[in-house]
Amino acid sequence: MKCPYCGETEDKVIDSRQGKEADVIRRRRECLSCSRRFTTYEKVEDMPLVIIKKDGRREVFNGEKVRAGMLRACEKRNISVHVIDEFIEQLERDLRETGEKEVPSHQVGEAIMNKLHELDDVAYVRFASVYREFKHVNDFISELKYLLKQQQKGGK
């Protein structure tokens, strides 16, 4: 580490402790050249989570974009924003825990679809109509038939 006083790079660590944030380490150092002390902070570099879109474009995961889509689907439904926000936080954690730096968008979309299916069928169909790019009324009918079949099986 370069000494802020004399510019030398040789130093020794006198003290290390966890910073106020759990992902930061605070180190007290002493320059071996001028004997002055200084503090440094180490933090793990955040690796951006990249989503691979259908057309091959890559985009950094944006929880706000997911939130906006889910809120649109859940509009005028009895689903709290808190539930949506918790889901998005968990989704991002789950995606990061895979260890993959890049995740296909369909993996994110399907996770959202599964959560909405669990929460509210109307919100699910609304989201599905955009996510699956429904073009005709028959697309809605097919999805509704699927939901009815799931309900008859005892899925909901």
From Swiss-Prot:
Keywords (A to Z) from UniProt: ATP-binding, DNA-binding, Metal-binding, Nucleotide-binding, Repressor, Transcription, Transcription regulation, Zinc, Zinc-finger
Gene Ontology molecular function: any one: DNA binding
Zn finger (unnamed) ranges are 3-34
Q: Domain ATP-cone spans what residues?
A: 49-139
Out of the domains of life, which is the source? Bacteria
Q: Which residues form the signal peptide?
A: none
Q: Which Pfam families match?
A: ATP-cone (PF03477), Zn_ribbon_NrdR (PF22811)
Cofactor(s) listed in the protein's UniProt record: Zn(2+)
A single GO BP annotation from the record? negative regulation of DNA-templated transcription
InterPro entries the UniProt entry points to: ATP-cone_dom (IPR005144), NrdR-like_N (IPR055173), RNR_NrdR-like (IPR003796)
Free-text comment on the cofactor: Binds 1 zinc ion.
Write down the PANTHER family for this protein, in alphabetical order. TRANSCRIPTIONAL REPRESSOR NRDR
Q: What does this protein do?
A: Negatively regulates transcription of bacterial ribonucleotide reductase nrd genes and operons by binding to NrdR-boxes.
Please state which protein family the record places this protein in: Belongs to the NrdR family.
The protein's name in its UniProt record: Transcriptional repressor NrdR
